[in-house]
Amino acid sequence: MKTFILLAVLGLASASVHQHKIVWRESKKMGMIRTGQYPAYLEYQRNLRAVSPNVLANLPQNVNDFGDFEYLGNITIGTPDQGFIVVLDTGSSNLWIPGPTCKTNCKTKSKFDSTASSTFVKNGKSWTIQYGSGDAAGILGQDTVRFGAKGDSQLSVPTTTFGIASKISADFKNDATDGILGLAFTSLAVDGVVPPLINAINQGILDQPLFSVWLEHRGAANNVGGGVFTYGAIDTTNCGALVAYQPLSSATYYQFKAAGFKLGSYSNTKTVDVISDTGTSFLGGPQSVVDGLAKAAGATYDDFNEVYFIDCAAQPGTLDITIGTNTYSIQPVNYIVDAGNGQCLFAAFPFDFGGFGPSWILGDPFIRQYCNIYDIGNKRMGFAPSLQK
């Protein structure tokens, strides 16, 4: 009995809460719009789809366009630590970073050297992952993964399986990141690999089987503070009182039901599946609904850039999303974004999942307005007002 009590106390003592500070950086998409290069990139994407029309069909990761992320975090892998910059992505589930055999498109990337890590365990199984924009391939390995930069307080997760890329597509070539850290469920992961955070929960490393995300407003310069991911607890420093929880309709993505979208005179009350996605800098939804919201805001669609331009001084009112019995209102400061050169964008895009999965992506404009609480253990999402400084 004494042994059992001692083990229980030790177990409680080992569980913890970790805060992972992130930085904001202008997305590749926004940079290309600002410099007039985005139409050429869109043409490249159209040509890619024309050559391989079935490549993106029915893929669980096709929600992701990694030209569209804006918030980045540091991780380390191995013993001693090797550092990497990654997208912290709730819209996918796999962790991968480049390895030393990745040459094309990897010249500016940090690469994981398995021979330099005393805790590395060879797996050898090959893997390939295809996103809505971009792909990567290589072999799997196992090592200790730590959330946070070297020298910071880190969440350390031993025996974590991850991808070591020998090839990445040109989509990732000029990104400010080395790889992707997926935070969604194992059921979404390629090859059924247990994601690092799920692995931490399975090992009892966290106080609670959840994490919360607070995103700051978009920065005025790259590499400034962008927010905090809190693992194992709700962030009560940067987030207000919980509004409500909403059960997940699918524990793959963080997918749940929304019952309406409204802005000004326009409203749509169809109940749809939506996902919370930290890796998408805009809101994404059906063409007809996004068009209606944009028109109500006074935004105009630009076919050349495939975006909605809006007057930077516009004050159209809140964009209201009904989830459960509550209405969540996004202020214009979070859905009107500066594209440079005196231009601003209505931060939404037409999105078609092809009949599979969610109808809407609730990206950074929603998460900047409301802290999102990813309650993995209870398979539900929670929302609390962001306490922006």
From Swiss-Prot:
It is found in: Secreted. GO terms for cellular component: extracellular space; lysosome. Coiled coil: none annotated. It is an enzyme of class 3 (hydrolase). Glycans are attached at residue 74. SUPFAM superfamilies: Acid proteases. Its EC number is 3.4.23.-. This is Aspartic protease 6.
